[in-house]
A protein has these predicted regions:
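Signature for HUH/AEP ssDNA processing cores
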Residues: 1-119, 124-137, 141-144, 216-224, ...
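Residues that form or immediately flank small-molecule/cofactor binding pockets and catalytic motifs
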Residues: 35, 116, 163-166, 188
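A generic structural signal for well-ordered coil/turn residues at beta-strand boundaries
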Residues: 82-84, 154-157
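Modules that initiate DNA replication and primer synthesis
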Residues: 89-90, 116-141, 165-169, 203-325
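Helical (often loop-to-helix) elements that flank the catalytic cores of nucleotide-handling enzymes
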Residues: 98-104, 125-150, 169-200, 311-316
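A glycine-rich phosphate-binding loop feature that marks nucleotide/adenosyl-phosphate handling sites
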Residues: 155-164, 282
């Protein structure tokens, strides 16, 4: 039976969620439920607007699941990209860490206490969506700087949803109750040094060949023959084709588009740009096909994959943005 709006617990939960969403404005939010005992995910993925998430029936549904042992997680959603918010999981942290973040211009827009001595901070670093490789690099830097959990430092990691209890057995009191996930700080806005964080990450990932046009390929980070084998490149490329059912869906495929999809996918998985280029060079069917300047084509394809035009993201197969990790 769904809890009514007169239930004081529901009202407190709604207030907490409203504060959290106000600190992290976005069009859609991914909500994920993970069972504290079995560690399995609740069937289905839920993408809700702020209004939908704050609906009394939605809140009632989530509260019932929480009482049944499900932990609630959320992330601002941007399909196959990061929405501009980075999670820093601060295990065994105190307020001094948050103050240090502020002194360095990495002001969190939201800080949660997930249990006594355990904090999660969200840092707003971009008003536009970020490529996975860029967001992951920013997350790793913040985790290193402030002692965050490196296992949580990636572009798609979800954080706790305020207003519910932490159902982990290790966090429960002697009486068996889970601690409430509480908001310590909530204030929307970009971190003052957000631009520097993103720029640093972009420099880390920007293909070296973009810096100069006159250097020899071996000086530009071009993959050597030993960097990746023909069999490895072919296996990687064919795996992408099979998972996306390219041959069944497109006859014949536009290989330049498939190359771009493969490059974006591999970059999002953390593969260095030179190795991505090698996969395309060795694994793309009949390469170099009719390209007059094959090396320039590879340069431009990987650069476009890493830094899509500002006018909008390049479409990718749905399989690339359906996965979300804990």
């Amino acid at each position: 039976m769904m809890a009514s709006m007169n239930d004081r617990g529901v009202v407190l939960t709604i207030k907490a969620i409203r504060r959290q969403l106000a600190a992290m404005p976005n069009d859609l939010y991914l909500i994920r439920l993970i069972h504290s005992w079995t560690h399995r995910a609740f069937p289905g993925e839920r993408l809700w607007t702020a209004a939908q998430l704050l609906d009394s029936e939605t809140i009632g549904f989530l509260r019932v699941r929480n009482r049944e042992g499900w932990d609630l997680y959320m992330q601002p959603h941007a399909r196959n990209q990061n929405a501009g918010y980075i999670l820093v999981d601060l295990d065994h942290a105190d307020a001094q860490v948050v103050e240090q973040m502020r002194r360095n211009g990495h002001h969190p827009c939201l800080v949660l206490q997930t249990s006594p001595g355990h904090l999660q901070a969200w840092v707003h670093v971009s008003m536009t969506a970020l490529e996975p490789c860029i967001a992951t690099t920013v997350a790793m830097q913040l985790a290193r700087d402030y002692g965050g959990d490196p296992a949580s430092a990636d572009w798609r990691h979800v954080g706790r949803l305020a207003g519910f209890t932490n159902q982990k057995l290790s966090r429960r009191s002697l009486a068996g109750y889970g601690p409430w996930v509480q908001i310590v700080h909530a204030r929307a806005g970009l971190a003052p040094q957000a631009g520097a964080l993103v720029e640093s990450a972009m420099q880390r990932w920007r293909p070296l060949w973009l810096a100069t046009d006159s250097s020899h390929p071996s000086q530009l980070g071009m993959p050597s023959a030993a960097a990746i084998t023909l069999d490895q490149a072919t296996a990687i490329y064919q795996d992408c084709m099979q998972r996306w059912r390219i041959a069944q869906r497109f006859s014949p495929p536009d290989w330049s588009i498939v190359d771009l999809w493969v490059a974006r996918h591999l970059l999002s998985e953390g593969m260095p740009a030179p190795e991505v280029q090698a996969v395309l060079q060795l694994g793309s069917p009949q390469f170099p096909r009719r390209h007059g300047n094959p090396q320039d084509y590879l340069h431009r394809t990987v650069a476009r994959a890493a830094f899509p035009p500002r006018g909008g993201p390049v479409w990718v197969p749905p399989a690339l943005y359906r996965r979300v990790t804990r």
